[in-house]
Regions:
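Short juxtamembrane and helix-loop transition motifs at transmembrane-helix boundaries
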Residues: 97-100, 125-134
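Short helix-to-coil transition segments within interhelical loops
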Residues: 85-93
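Hydrophobic/aromatic residues in alpha-helical transmembrane segments
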Residues: 66-70, 118, 149-150, 276
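Transmembrane alpha-helical segments and their membrane-interface loop/helix boundaries
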Residues: 1-60, 128-132, 143-297
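Hydrophobic alpha-helical interface/terminus motif in multipass membrane transporters
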Residues: 74, 86, 121-122, 154, ...
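Long, hydrophobic alpha-helical segments
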Residues: 50-76, 80
């Protein structure tokens, strides 16, 4: 973990990442200054746009880099024929899996923390509080843990790093774009059925994707959008979701959507981590929870 954080590759990634953010921030500040000179007005929304842009870049980075970092963590050891050696040590299997995940999380944490100075520019004119930053970091942390646990799971189950990486990305795409596609299809089918006995206006008000809408609770992109929209947007995700997926009901889940989604995603991550530990366990478990024998996989 320490060696990786001091590598030239890590420094290059930090340099490129922060150079892009700094360039965007400078361009944003320049456009605000030019607008003041021209119209004598300050568009404070541009600072919120900068905050949204930086946060979105971090989210996309977590969504697609974390699976790549973790998908080869266990399968790579198996390919180098060092996994059996690690299994003979006194290290707990849980600690080994969590250590692999933590190593990747630290890399992403360094990138996220390095972007704080650019995000802090929004504090100059207000609109975002420290509580908002904390909520954003919590959302990013859950996304990183979930996508990282997906990579760890496939890395433990599959023998080849290439296959585990592909499966990890397919799962991430299924959680994000897949849940949206399923809900969009269900809403279109419900809308077509409603049009057969109601006017177009009433049909659009009645139709919805039904219970499938709750699949969005496992969608990291929807969770992030809900958080960032509440901080720098309208604060109501229904304005964007209802025209695409139908009416969302008023209940305890929709009222606390962000909390419910983050909790469920953490539970899913824990299940995947537990499954990864089980997958690399050499032998069967006895009633005390310890493995018997040294059955090589």
């Amino acid at each position: 973990m320490t060696v990786g954080s001091r590598s030239i590759r890590m420094m290059a990634i930090l340099f490129v990442f922060n150079s892009i953010l700094a360039a965007v921030a400078l361009f944003n500040m320049y456009s605000v200054a030019e607008q003041v000179r021209t119209t004598a007005e300050i568009q404070y929304s541009q600072f919120l746009d900068l905050y949204t842009f930086v946060s979105s870049i971090e989210f996309i980075m977590l969504l697609f880099i974390m699976p790549a970092l973790t998908a080869s963590s266990i399968s790579g050891e198996r390919e180098r024929q060092t996994l059996e050696l690690m299994l003979t040590t006194t290290m707990e299997l849980r600690d080994m899996v969590l250590g692999k995940l933590a190593s990747s999380l630290v890399t992403m944490l360094v990138l996220a923390v390095s972007a704080l100075p650019v995000q802090a520019l929004v504090f100059v004119y207000g609109g975002i509080t420290l509580q908002d930053i904390g909520m954003l970091f919590l959302c990013h942390g859950v996304v990183a843990i979930l996508t990282g646990s997906i990579g760890i799971f496939y890395s433990s189950v599959l023998r080849r790093s290439t296959v585990s990486t592909v499966c990890s990305y397919v799962t991430v795409v299924a959680l994000t774009a897949g849940t949206m596609a399923v809900n969009l299809f269900a809403y279109r089918m419900a809308l077509r059925a409603a049009n057969s006995y109601a006017s177009n206006l009433n049909a659009s008000e009645m139709a919805s994707s039904g219970i499938l809408r709750y699949l969005f609770l496992f969608n990291p992109a929807v969770s992030f959008y809900n958080v960032i929209n509440g901080q720098a947007g309208s604060g109501d995700m229904r304005k964007w979701f209802e025209p695409l997926f139908g009416v969302f009901p008023d209940n305890a889940i929709t009222a606390h959507w962000t909390a419910c989604s983050l909790i469920l995603q953490c539970i899913l991550a824990m299940v995947l981590i537990a499954a990864a530990v089980w997958a690399i366990t050499p032998g069967k478990w006895n009633r005390h929870g310890k493995n018997k024998g040294n059955d090589n996989r």
